[in-house]
Amino acid sequence: MTKILVIDDELEICKQISLILSKQGYEVTYANSYKEFSDLEQRNFDYDVVLVDLWLKNSTKQGIDIIEYLKNKYENLVIVSFSGHANIDNAIESVKAGANDFIEKPFETKKLIHIIQKNLLELKQRVTINNYRNKISFHSKIDTIG
C-alpha cells in the first residue's frame, strides 16, 4: 500500500486530504507543523509520497526547507508541493528545491489524485531504468575482468 504524508498547518486541510486519499486506497498520515514532521521523520520514515504546503504558519521551517531536506535524504520519494498563495515563482522555487510537482490550493480531487499517480509511475519507471543500468554495468565489469 502506498503511504502518503501530508504536511499542512491547517488541520482541516490535512483531514480533507487524508479522507480523499484514504478512499483511494492510500495510507495517509499528516503533520501540522515542521516539529510534527520532524518527530515523524525521526521515528520511522517510510513514506512513498509527501504532500507539503509551502507556507507553514508558526513553524521554524517552511515547506521549501522540508522539500530540500527530503530530496537530499531520500532518493526514491515523490514530493508534491502546494500553496494557497500560489504564483509561478513559488512553483519554480519548489521544483528547484526538489519537488516533483506543484498544485495550487484549492485543488480538485481528480487533479490531486492524477498528480500523485503520475509521479508514482514516473518514480517506478526511474527505479526500473536505474536497476537495468546497474545490471548492465555489473555485467560489463564481469566481461572485462582478466
Language-model region placement:
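Two-component/phosphorelay signaling modules centered on CheY-like receiver
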Residues: 11-30, 35
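Short amphipathic alpha-helix used as the core "switch/output" element in two-component signaling
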Residues: 60-76
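C-terminal output helix
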Residues: 87, 107-116
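The C-terminal output helix
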Residues: 117-131
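AAA+ ATPase active-site-proximal loops
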Residues: 133-146
